[in-house]
């Protein structure tokens, strides 16, 4: 039986402050009930060992006794249920967060981030599997990550999810109703998930963390209502309200149009965190001035995408100028630069905005986006083109815009295979899974001599170079003299 593992889990919960000593009997009985056990044999002492090992032992026991199905989704649903038993109620979490916030906003977020890891909502051991590195490019050190922390569903679980009754509750994975939700085969369990209410622009929003943590303290700021993404004047006000309350965090919004937006357009939300991206480090390459806003520092950023940076001590001035730029961009057409505000009544122009505090001033980066498609570029003219799809095909959302490539899990094995083939001189086209990389590999062989010692490092740098190209493709005004001239034409039109 798994009594020792239950005792170890109780010991973990006590050490991390999830429960107190007076909760022990209640918590052990709740765990026994979940494990379908009717009695308790006290192992006397808890062993201190990794949470992943404790949960694995409990899952193996539950599967062996047919308490759960032995597939990845069922296991995730069940270990979340176990951790949910040990997770304090929302009222306790909110009270503790607010108490710490009164002393220091950073102390509050430090505590909440650690808490979300201790509850296993953020699975540290899975996040640790992600492959991460930086790559030097003309635009600075770009961050590259191959995301391995999102669980991949096995075929049995996919089939079971299709057969399960369909429900629209919660409406999406960002809705506040996820807090405490037991989950189902096609929706993750969230019993150990907690959110903190905040007010921005006099609206009820919530702060939580991403369970997949693409960067340090990767937080999500979500609307209390299931309402679609929208970039407007109120968006700029909300972003600046957030950094006013949490000045150590940046926050940004995905764009509100398909192709250039993120993966979730149905629920209004922002993403932020305690991290400095390459785009934030990028300097202003040309100072510009907007009429009637001479008090606002403005410039074009040295970045592969088209970025206007605004700085001012008065946040309301930034809101007003950002709104003017947005309105101008929404209606802007420059046929010579292949920029069209709309075609056949479909709008194409929008903005990806990012806000931060820097040296006591408010700062807004406005990234100009356009989602027009053509026969030659059916996925988007300002989207990674076909020749880069072997590395990155997905939308270029907020995180990528700022200089962090979130690459698919398939690349872990594929890049290992490419490295082996380059060292041995194997034909990549003979391997179905690696053939997509063959043209790229041919180019690399011209530039480098690959050995067993250097292949991995060289490939990592070359993946970074591909990501820089991805961002160049997504940039509306290119980093060429002609591109900068067309960029200035837009600036002068504002």
What are these regions (language model features)?
Residues 1-221, 225-228, 302-304, 318-322, ...:
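Active-site microenvironments that recognize anionic phosphate/pyrophosphate groups
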Residues 192-194, 224-251:
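Helical scaffold of the NTase/Pol beta-like nucleotidyltransferase catalytic core
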